[in-house]
């Protein structure tokens, strides 16, 4: 069992959060899992729909553009040839097969679990009390949001905030306060966070409810 301290809006310790040992259990080659997961995320963002027409697919007359002899020009067969404007493309991109990269749920959960555990072990994950997200700021105040980061000794660089989806109606004050800070990378919700968000973020501030929900989701089916 691992204990993490949680902080209130003023940087004071407000209790502890327990994490099961199964959360830190590593399955297989962890770095390879993370690499495969990130490659899948980045590859699947592409549409894979680039398609060009060759000379047999473009719409052109098959009539010769000019007579075979007597003009002084090189002989030409039709305007669909690639050297003409509007002609077919040679060796252009074609969606020949489904190029999306697939990764199963077990691998995805193991990769996210490894990334989160690394953030915890390097002291780059701060657990905030739920009141920080829901009750601390009723109106947007960037200065107060920055003061919270400094009071928790969070390095103001690449900070990702993660909250529980059930708080979406109540965290608008904090969310709007953070969007004007260059140090804040983004605002995500527990079950929607992916490995690319975690890799890109240098520091993470997560609410207690989001962390417990995420840990329960990621450790379901693992051996204690």
Swiss-Prot record:
Pfam families linked: Ribosomal_L4
Keywords: Ribonucleoprotein, Ribosomal protein, RNA-binding, rRNA-binding
Region (Disordered): 54-73
Gene3D superfamilies given in the database record: 3.40.1370.10
The keyword Chloroplast is assigned to this record: no
GO process annotations (BP): translation
A cellular-component GO term for this protein: ribonucleoprotein complex
A single MF term (Gene Ontology): rRNA binding
Membership in a protein family: Belongs to the universal ribosomal protein uL4 family.
Complex and partners: Part of the 50S ribosomal subunit.
Purpose of the protein: One of the primary rRNA binding proteins, this protein initially binds near the 5'-end of the 23S rRNA. It is important during the early stages of 50S assembly. It makes multiple contacts with different domains of the 23S rRNA in the assembled 50S subunit and ribosome. Forms part of the polypeptide exit tunnel.
Protein name: Large ribosomal subunit protein uL4
Organism: Chlamydia felis (strain Fe/C-56) (Chlamydophila felis)
Phylogenetic lineage: Bacteria, Pseudomonadati, Chlamydiota, Chlamydiia, Chlamydiales
